[in-house]
């Protein structure tokens, strides 16, 4: 699933191609990808609208069109990109926004989990997930104190807490694992058990990991592409995610993959000791995107500078 760095990269690559453009027509090939309003109203209301700006909130893209906001959620495999009308149409193409310069803003989605909400002038139709998002981890408002307050008293694992979009917006499986490795905290640790020093270290690691991933334009395994159709470059810098069986870049201990918060979770059993009394369910390691090749830029925990 595209996480904050991938969605931010899509936003940055779409802005120069879309902002200022007028929608001539909306072609809806798969009506189920339109969540609000009904597809016919959706297409009619957007005809003639101009893209004023594109913003991001967590994993959501927000297209501002005058008093209206078009919300896009890519979920597992959604892909928003701009191309010319002559470009071949992919098999899983669902929505096409025809622009006044002849270009097309296309939405493709192999698994069909993503889609669109068109909000009314008063915010009508806002998806609950967007309305309940926690703080942006790269914003000034996200401080160690804010993170500590949101983790306090929570008995879930710290991995589950980081995946909870109502606590912190934008983190997913990849960067939760990377941030916890950077902070030397086991993913199964009880969230409320972290010490002030550990919370501060985790806060810094979340920000460093995300900033580096944004700089590297996100992580591509198979489906993710940016708004121009390009892959992200972060894969070879991942320290633990998708590295099961490979040596830890710090101590050489083989990286393990287990189930935490019902998600495949990667960690170093030496750098991130298993909490006492916690039983872990192993997960089968799959070959990495490049055949489980050795990573190019292994960095020890706490770096990502």
Curated annotation (Swiss-Prot):
Pfam family name, one: zf-FPG_IleRS
EC number: 3.2.2.23, 4.2.99.18
Catalytic activity: Hydrolysis of DNA containing ring-opened 7-methylguanine residues, releasing 2,6-diamino-4-hydroxy-5-(N-methyl)formamidopyrimidine; 2'-deoxyribonucleotide-(2'-deoxyribose 5'-phosphate)-2'-deoxyribonucleotide-DNA = a 3'-end 2'-deoxyribonucleotide-(2,3-dehydro-2,3-deoxyribose 5'-phosphate)-DNA + a 5'-end 5'-phospho-2'-deoxyribonucleoside-DNA + H(+)
Cofactors, names only: Zn(2+)
Annotated CDD domains: EcFpg-like_N
Active-site residues per Swiss-Prot or TrEMBL entry: 2 (schiff-base intermediate with dna), 3 (proton donor), 59 (proton donor), 263 (proton donor)
Chain positions recorded as DNA binding sites: 92, 111, 154
Database matches in SMART domains: Fapy_DNA_glyco, H2TH
Keyword rRNA-binding set for record: no
Mapped zinc finger ranges (FPG-type): 239-273
Region feature Disordered, mapped onto this chain: 282-305
Gene Ontology molecular functions: 8-oxo-7,8-dihydroguanine DNA N-glycosylase activity; class I DNA-(apurinic or apyrimidinic site) endonuclease activity; damaged DNA binding; zinc ion binding
Source taxon at top rank: Bacteria
Entries under SUPFAM superfamilies matching the protein: Glucocorticoid receptor-like (DNA-binding domain), N-terminal domain of MutM-like DNA repair proteins, S13-like H2TH domain
Cofactor: record remark: Binds 1 zinc ion per subunit.
GO annotation, biological process: base-excision repair
Gene3D superfamilies assigned to the protein according to its UniProt record, in alphabetical order: 1.10.8.50, MutM-like, N-terminal
Protein keywords: DNA damage, DNA repair, DNA-binding, Glycosidase, Hydrolase, Lyase, Metal-binding, Multifunctional enzyme, Zinc, Zinc-finger
UniProt-listed NCBIfam families: fpg, PRK01103.1
Role: Involved in base excision repair of DNA damaged by oxidation or by mutagenic agents. Acts as a DNA glycosylase that recognizes and removes damaged bases. Has a preference for oxidized purines, such as 7,8-dihydro-8-oxoguanine (8-oxoG). Has AP (apurinic/apyrimidinic) lyase activity and introduces nicks in the DNA strand. Cleaves the DNA backbone by beta-delta elimination to generate a single-strand break at the site of the removed base with both 3'- and 5'-phosphates.
Family affiliation: Belongs to the FPG family.
HAMAP family: Fapy_DNA_glycosyl
Assembly description: Monomer.
Protein name stated in the entry: Formamidopyrimidine-DNA glycosylase
Organism: Symbiobacterium thermophilum (strain DSM 24528 / JCM 14929 / IAM 14863 / T)
């Amino acid at each position: 699933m595209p996480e904050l760095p991938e969605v931010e990269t899509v936003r940055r690559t779409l802005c120069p191609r879309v902002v200022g453009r007028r929608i001539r027509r909306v072609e809806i090939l798969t009506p189920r990808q339109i969540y609000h309003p009904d597809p016919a109203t959706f297409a009619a209301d957007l005809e003639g609208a101009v893209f004023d700006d594109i913003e991001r909130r967590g994993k959501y893209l927000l297209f501002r069109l005058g008093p209206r906001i078009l919300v896009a959620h890519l979920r597992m495999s959604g892909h928003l990109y701009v191309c010319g009308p002559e470009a071949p149409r992919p098999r899983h193409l669902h929505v096409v926004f025809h622009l006044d310069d002849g270009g097309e803003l296309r939405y493709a989605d192999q698994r069909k989990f993503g889609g669109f909400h068109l909000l009314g002038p008063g915010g009508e139709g806002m998806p609950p997930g967007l309305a309940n998002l926690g703080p942006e981890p790269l914003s000034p408002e996200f401080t160690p104190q804010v993170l500590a307050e949101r983790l306090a008293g929570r008995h879930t694992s710290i991995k589950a807490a980081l995946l909870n979009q109502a606590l912190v917006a934008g983190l997913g499986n990849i960067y939760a694992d990377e941030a916890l490795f950077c902070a030397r905290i086991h993913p199964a640790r009880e969230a409320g058990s972290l010490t002030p020093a550990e919370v501060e270290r985790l806060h810094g690691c979340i920000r460093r990991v995300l900033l580096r991933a944004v700089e590297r334009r996100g992580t591509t395994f198979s489906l993710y592409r940016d708004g121009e159709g390009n892959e992200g470059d972060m894969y070879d810098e991942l320290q633990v995610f998708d590295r099961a069986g490979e040596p830890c870049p710090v101590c050489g201990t083989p990286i393990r993959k287990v189930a935490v918060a019902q998600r495949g979770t990667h960690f170093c059993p030496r750098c991130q000791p298993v909490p006492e009394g916690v039983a872990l369910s192993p997960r089968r390691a799959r070959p990495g995107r490049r055949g489980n090749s050795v990573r190019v830029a292994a960095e020890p925990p706490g770096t990502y500078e």
